[in-house]
């Protein structure tokens, strides 16, 4: 899964992107990326992959609780939603007019604004 000697790849998903889940129990569900974990190739998506987390009793909460939280999902199961068309698109990278490497939509060819 994670090898500390292996170089991590650039990911097509960034924090703040709107994505759609491609496979699994949450297939076709959309959400915003809350956090990305590049070393393990996973991301937390808002409203997707909800799990129950058991909290121990504390002085503040002597009963203890069961909370519903989002768990990470593998990046290969996510596809970026293009803001212009609201449809999933594949991502590529190419140089823009300023010579900077930018993400672009392979469907429309337009550059994707970061963040």
From Swiss-Prot:
User: Signal peptide location in the record?
Assistant: none
Disulphide linkage map: none
Spell out the family assignment given in the record's similarity comment: Belongs to the universal ribosomal protein uL24 family.
Subunit organization: Part of the 50S ribosomal subunit.
This molecule's function is given as: One of two assembly initiator proteins, it binds directly to the 5'-end of the 23S rRNA, where it nucleates assembly of the 50S subunit. One of the proteins that surrounds the polypeptide exit tunnel on the outside of the subunit.
Could you give one GO CC term from the UniProt record?
ribonucleoprotein complex
Q: Mind giving the lineage of the organism this protein is from?
A: Bacteria, Pseudomonadati, Bacteroidota, Cytophagia, Cytophagales
Protease among keywords: no
Could you list this entry's UniProt keywords, alphabetically sorted. Answer: Ribonucleoprotein, Ribosomal protein, RNA-binding, rRNA-binding
> What InterPro entries does the entry give?
KOW, Rib_uL2_dom2, Ribosomal_uL24, Ribosomal_uL24_CS, Ribosomal_uL24_KOW, Translation_prot_SH3-like_sf
- Which biological process, per GO, is one annotated for this protein? translation
**Coiled coil regions in record:** none
Q: Does the keyword Ribonucleoprotein apply?
A: yes
UniProt GO molecular function: rRNA binding; structural constituent of ribosome
Q: Which SUPFAM superfamilies has this protein been placed in?
A: Translation proteins SH3-like domain (SSF50104)
Q: What is the designated name of this protein? A: Large ribosomal subunit protein uL24
Matching entries from HAMAP family are given as: Ribosomal_uL24_B
Record-linked Pfam families: KOW (PF00467), ribosomal_L24 (PF17136)
């Amino acid at each position: 899964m994670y090898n500390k000697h292996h170089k991590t790849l650039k990911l097509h998903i960034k924090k703040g992107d709107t994505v759609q889940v491609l496979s699994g129990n949450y297939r076709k569900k959309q959400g915003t990326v809350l956090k990305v974990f590049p070393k393990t190739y996973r991301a937390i998506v808002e409203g997707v992959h909800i799990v129950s987390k058991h909290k121990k009793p504390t002085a503040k909460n002597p009963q203890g609780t069961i909370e519903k939280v989002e768990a990470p999902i593998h990046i290969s199961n996510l596809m970026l939603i293009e803001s212009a068309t609201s449809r999933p698109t594949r991502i590529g990278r190419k140089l823009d007019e300023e010579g900077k490497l930018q993400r672009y939509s392979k469907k429309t060819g337009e550059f994707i604004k970061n963040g």
